[in-house]
Amino acid sequence: AACSELADLARSLKAVLHLHVAETKMESAALEAEHGASIVRILAEHGVFGGRVLAAHCVWVDDADIAVLSDAGVAVAHCPVSNMKLGSGIAPLAAMLSAGVTLGLGTDGPASNDSLDLWEEVKMAALLARVAALDSTAVTPAQVLAMATRGAAAAVGLDDVGRLAEGFVADMIRIDLDHSTFVPVTEPSELLAHLVWAGSDRRVTDVWVAGEPVVVDGRVTNVDEDRARAEVSSRAVRLAEG
């Protein structure tokens, strides 16, 4: 009932409803044993998927569940590093892509990810999808990079970010392509492969948010990093002491 009410409220506000779905095997099995249906079908039957919904994880979903997600236009936040750290499982990424589910990459949160490194998510998403399918072509570099950009924007309901185009917000990064990591390149697909298999946040030199520089030559411009680190350490000690 609570989820249905939240879904109604989200629809009335034209907001995105975000919830975690089918993250662990134990949770999913318990719900199915009690209700005789998967959590995806339970949510669909209660009208939760009637608006803009972002479902995190979706690890323990079958083909029927994926069809429901696709038909309802539910977007999925795929968080491969968190899923590995917590031992949750491997989401059926290739199957969701094939079914046309809107997919964006996420880091979940610092308690279940630590580094919050989106480049790592890109690589891990591709690797896990390939090993799960036993197929080295199951997911391409272009597909996972799209999940980190256009797909992520679509997943959270933003229609003016995620790519460089006229009228879009100027959210951009600069990558040091002169680094040996990214050579040689004889065609564009090779560069995409280098970005996925060998890229990292260490190769990002500059970041712009809405056209404003927030990282320049590897240094954050809008936060005093030394002060932030000192404050975090101080607060951690106080919290540990109770």
Regions inferred by a protein language model and the residue ranges of each:
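Histidine/acidic residue-rich metal-binding segments in metalloenzymes
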Residues: 1-75, 87-103
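Generic structural signal for well-ordered, non-membrane alpha-helical segments
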Residues: 3, 36, 115, 141, ...
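Generic beta-strand/beta-sheet core signal
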Residues: 20-22, 56-58, 77-79, 106, ...
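Short, acidic/turn-prone active-site loops that include or flank metal/cofactor-
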Residues: 23, 80-84, 109-111
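His/Asp/Glu-enriched, well-ordered alpha-helical/loop segment
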Residues: 45-52, 94-181
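Short beta->alpha connector loops
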Residues: 58-61, 82, 159
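Short, charged, surface-exposed secondary-structure boundary motifs
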Residues: 85-90, 114-116, 185
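Active-site microenvironment of metallo-dependent hydrolases
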Residues: 148-242
